């Protein structure tokens, strides 16, 4: 009995001995647990001041970003407000002194006051004088040289959207075309009108090309008509020419100038002079022949002039039936523009 009790007691004692470490561990104050080297990484409680510093840094960075965005937006707004004033300064660079009416009109666009516009132009003229210090320079040259002399982050007199590229005022229309913002609605009608002019100019160019092709055809038709009329005129004046040659007592020949006065020259150029006349003989008279173009070979020219001489001889035969011996004329071609009519005697057959 005692043994059992002892065992039980010993067991209890043993039980108490086994849990003593736990009781001792649980009985220790929390400061000891916190001071132990193994417990600190497990708990991981950060100190108070570094956490506050980190939060302050984050807040400062966020505020700096917001402030930077505000500054950038404000700078862009000021540039947009000053852009129409810069454009006016470029346009009137010979005399950059706007009148009161012009200042009022300039103030309406960027929603500025009259005093702000006046101050901006006064400051701009002052900057031009202080930056370009060369004496006896006109305002136009100062504005042109301003961007070359300006240094640092000073405001430049460019009218681009970001005011970063330096424009010397040589091509202000190009800067107007590249800008955006305030001046975009102003230039849209100009661009649309230019596009409409370009679109409208496509058809006139095609018409011009058609007209360029058409005149040779029209000219050739006129030339053919002129040649036909001249042929009729030549055939009509043969009788008068033969009468004049008879009145001159068979003088042999008359000069090319007289021939050109009496016969209208069918052409005034070498290309038109290549058109020649061809007449065909019929039983009752002569009919109008087509013009043979570009007769250049010597054999064709000989044949042509033989036909002309035969036609002249037949004309004289028809007109001089009552005479035994008459005269006729043969045309001798010396060049493309000069021709000579030579009168020769041709025996005629008497009709009974």
From Swiss-Prot:
Residues 71-132 bind DNA. GO terms for molecular function: DNA-binding transcription factor activity, RNA polymerase II-specific; RNA polymerase II cis-regulatory region sequence-specific DNA binding. CDD domains: homeodomain. Its main location: nucleus. Residues 19-53, 157-194, 245-272 are annotated as: Disordered. It is found in: Nucleus. One of its GO terms (cellular component) is nucleus. One of its GO terms (biological process) is cell development. The keyword Nucleus applies. It comes from the Eukaryota. SMART domains: HOX. InterPro entries: HD, Homeodomain-like_sf, KN_HD. Keywords: Developmental protein, DNA-binding, Homeobox, Nucleus. May act as a morphogenetic regulator of cell adhesion. Belongs to the TALE/IRO homeobox family. PANTHER family: HOMEOBOX PROTEIN MOHAWK, IROQUOIS-CLASS HOMEODOMAIN PROTEIN IRX. This is Homeobox protein Mohawk. It comes from Pongo abelii. The gene is MKX.
């Amino acid at each position: 009995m005692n043994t059992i009790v002892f065992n039980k007691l010993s067991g209890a004692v043993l039980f108490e001995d086994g849990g003593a470490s736990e009781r001792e561990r649980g009985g220790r104050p929390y400061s000891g647990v916190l001071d132990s080297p193994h417990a600190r990484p497990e708990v991981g409680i950060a100190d108070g001041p570094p956490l506050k510093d980190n939060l302050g840094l984050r807040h400062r960075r966020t505020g700096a970003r917001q402030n930077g965005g505000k500054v950038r937006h404000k700078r862009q707004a000021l540039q947009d407000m000053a852009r129409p004033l810069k454009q006016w300064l470029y346009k009137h660079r010979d005399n950059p002194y706007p009148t009161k009416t012009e200042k009022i009109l300039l103030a309406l666009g960027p929603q500025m006051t009259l005093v702000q516009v006046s101050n901006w132009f006064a400051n701009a003229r002052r900057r031009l004088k202080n930056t370009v210090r060369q004496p006896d320079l006109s305002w136009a040259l100062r504005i042109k040289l301003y961007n070359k002399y300006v240094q640092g982050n000073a405001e430049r007199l460019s009218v681009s959207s970001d005011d970063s590229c330096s424009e010397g005022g040589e091509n202000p229309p190009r800067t107007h075309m590249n800008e955006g913002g305030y001046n975009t609605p102003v230039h849209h009608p100009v661009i649309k009108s230019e596009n409409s002019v370009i679109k409208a100019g496509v058809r006139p160019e095609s018409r011009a090309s058609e007209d360029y092709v058409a005149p040779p055809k029209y000219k050739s038709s006129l030339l053919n008509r002129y040649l036909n009329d001249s042929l009729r005129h030549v055939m009509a004046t043969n009788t008068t020419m033969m009468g004049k040659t008879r009145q001159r007592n068979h003088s042999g020949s008359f000069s090319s100038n007289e021939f050109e006065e009496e016969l209208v020259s069918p052409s005034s150029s070498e290309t038109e002079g290549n058109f020649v006349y061809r007449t065909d003989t019929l039983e009752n008279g002569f009919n109008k022949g087509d013009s043979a173009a570009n007769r250049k070979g010597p054999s064709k020219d000989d044949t042509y002039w033989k036909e002309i001489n035969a036609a002249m001889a037949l004309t004289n035969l028809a007109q001089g039936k009552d005479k035994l011996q008459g005269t006729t004329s043969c045309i001798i071609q010396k060049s493309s523009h000069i021709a000579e009519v030579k009168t020769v005697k041709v025996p005629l057959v008497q009709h009974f």
